[in-house]
A protein has these predicted regions:
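A structural microfeature
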Residues: 120-122
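Active-site helix/loop of acyl-thioester processing domains in fatty-acid/polyketide metabolism
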Residues: 9, 36-64
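Catalytic strand-loop segment that frames the active site of acyl-thioester-processing enzymes
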Residues: 1-40
């Protein structure tokens, strides 16, 4: 069974996307009523994957072809900062913004908001496989 830490896409533009996630008490990444650091990191990674998949789905296909979205691999995580762990019942809004893209590699800046506060942020390098393109 997959570990899901995004419930939907709330915004999308050419360079940025935002997801929503509701922290539930029985989730694998919840301990003592708090959503863990590892859950926040996975939420950022899944938001990046959601962004890439949705962005790819919006491209105009070539007639007669059904291309598959690229598969992403995390190459590096930099400056992962967590200032607070959200409680069960919280709504998290995670925004990823592509700051640089070249030859199948993206650098994204990510932030996770709970209420009005940014509770986590990082920079992530993602490599997109072109094998299935």
């Amino acid at each position: 069974m997959p570990i899901v830490v995004v419930h939907g896409l709330t915004e999308h533009s050419e360079t940025s996307s935002t997801s929503i996630f509701y922290v539930e008490g029985d989730h694998l990444f919840v301990r003592e009523g708090k959503f863990l650091h590892s859950g926040l990191m996975e939420n950022i990674a899944q938001t990046s994957a959601l962004r890439s998949g949705y962005h790819f789905s919006q491209q105009v296909p070539v007639e007669g072809e059904t291309p598959e979205p690229p598969i992403g691999f995390i190459g590096a995580i930099k400056n992962f900062i967590v200032t607070d762990l959200p409680s069960v019942g919280s709504e998290l809004y995670t925004t990823v913004t592509v700051t640089y893209e070249v030859m199948g590699m993206q650098v994204v800046e990510a932030s996770v908001k709970c209420g009005r506060n940014i509770i986590a942020s990082c920079e992530m390098k993602i490599f997109l496989s072109q094998e299935n393109q």
